[in-house]
Design a protein with these regions (language model features):
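Non-heme di-metal
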Residues: 1-179
């Protein structure tokens, strides 16, 4: 049987969208309950949000098989962000402005810029991945272990953190964003 193009595929896509939407909604409800002083209720919303995430993951990975490899996922993400930035939110801005919803139109205008930045970030990471430059640079840089904070200076991240022994996968370029 061919899933592609079937009603079942459409149902799975709808299920994924619904479970994803419910997860976010319950997360936001949890934040509200927490802000209002209801920790127990917040924990129920969070637990349910995690259940919804598990449901969405099953549909996404097991049935739709949409979670490929990291390189393909980066390209797919860049394409999605480009679509939102260049098409979808431009249209939404135009429609909101035409209907007189200036604040909402301005929101979509700003959102286009953010989504465009997301596209560029995903593409740059994709290019670095394809070039073998995720854990390697042409000059010495500071690499930071995301587990323990250890800083290594060199052209490559170490194979393992000398402090906590976590693997290279936990290293990123150190960014001093507090200056």
């Amino acid at each position: 049987m061919q899933l592609n193009g079937s009603k079942t595929e459409r149902n799975l896509l709808s299920t994924f969208a619904g479970e994803s939407r419910a997860r976010n909604k319950y997360t936001f409800y949890a934040e509200k309950a927490e802000n209002e002083g209801y920790e127990y209720i917040a924990s129920i919303f969070e637990a349910t949000a995690n259940n919804e995430k598990a449901h969405a993951r099953e549909v996404f990975n097991r049935f739709l098989k949409m979670n490929k490899n990291t390189a393909d996922n980066l390209k797919d993400s860049a394409e999605g962000e480009a679509h939102e930035s260049n098409n979808l939110y431009k249209q939404f801005e135009k429609e909101a402005r035409a209907e007189g919803f200036t604040e909402i139109a301005n929101f979509y205008k700003e959102l286009q810029e953010v989504e465009g930045n997301h596209e560029m970030r995903f593409m740059k990471i994709y290019e670095n991945l394809e070039a073998g430059m995720i854990f390697k640079k042409n000059t010495d840089v500071k690499w930071q272990c995301m587990n323990c904070g250890y800083i290594h200076i060199g052209k490559e991240a170490p194979a393992f953190c000398p402090l906590c022994k976590f693997p290279r996968a936990y290293f990123k370029i150190y960014c001093e964003d507090y200056k």
